[in-house]
């Protein structure tokens, strides 16, 4: 009987991608099958994130629950990966002696030998930052569905004062150009229609081609667009300083690149941006966005915001709110500031009271929610092209898909053959976090035109 693998993933899309590759790896090496029930698993993996406050506490709390499973089954193998593993290393095992394997994002390709060692009750830790060798050791991806992530680079070299990523994932290392395209081809052959290119600082990508040239993110986008079966391309996460002219031109000239961009700004106040060492000021960001809007009219924009960074005044927060209105963001990942151990900002006085941080955050989120709702209302009556991902989790009588500008659309339909296909829906109603539509055509129709 096949052994069972359970993976719990915390954090970003990079971690989601890494978890899927862990499953591919152990599926090939040990013929393991994924399960969503930890109690029936032979191997438990916790893929961790250290971006937010109390990340370590969250990890140890989960490991405490898994300890009970280990007591019932001493042969159960428990592994901790991801960014908390990189930060904590062997300290994890000092607090949780039942953990067999500790590995970082760059060493997950060694999981088969780690599992073998754990089977002999040999604990192992490897949180090193080797060159981007893991992709040379991973099997072909196995996917279900029409959308897939593809990691094109690892790490970040920006060293923003609040961020742990350079310390947990290492500095920027780009994956070879042809390695990326090979993975995309493998995904497209399995029916993937939308490719989401990933990197902690994805637009800093500078990868070698087989001809000895250097490719950037725009080159990747144009090459992926030429692969049979791929109809949509997204990328996350970008840095304003790395947003090149060639990438702006990709928005102008590449129709398969979607009309949505996530470009973190963190704050709208120049003194806070300087304290964060973001490498740009407010006006630089505005100018960059205006050029992107000129290249792709109607593009949907989202961003990251940190509220209550050390030194943030009421006036600084007003600057952030004014920037949100000027740019017209319709979504954000926004959080109150919390000190991350080992970062330069952790040496600064966290001088904004928590209740003030939370009040500012609520104001910001209300503003962006209203802007998002206004944009959604403006879409009512329009026909939108969506990629259908599956059934609505709230209503099995509805199918669900995503628009180019990253909005979820639910519509009444009962044909499972539509899943994984493109369709046109007319938007009939707008809600705070989704749209409702009616099907007007799909790839199942003989006269449907993709482009």
From Swiss-Prot:
[4Fe-4S] cluster 1 binds at residues 12, 49, 83. Its EC number is 2.8.4.3. Pfam families: Radical_SAM, TRAM, UPF0004. Its cofactor is [4Fe-4S] cluster. [4Fe-4S] cluster 2 binds at residues 156, 160, 163. HAMAP family: tRNA_metthiotr_MiaB. This is tRNA-2-methylthio-N(6)-dimethylallyladenosine synthase. It comes from Marinomonas sp. (strain MWYL1). The lineage of its organism: Bacteria, Pseudomonadati, Pseudomonadota, Gammaproteobacteria, Oceanospirillales.
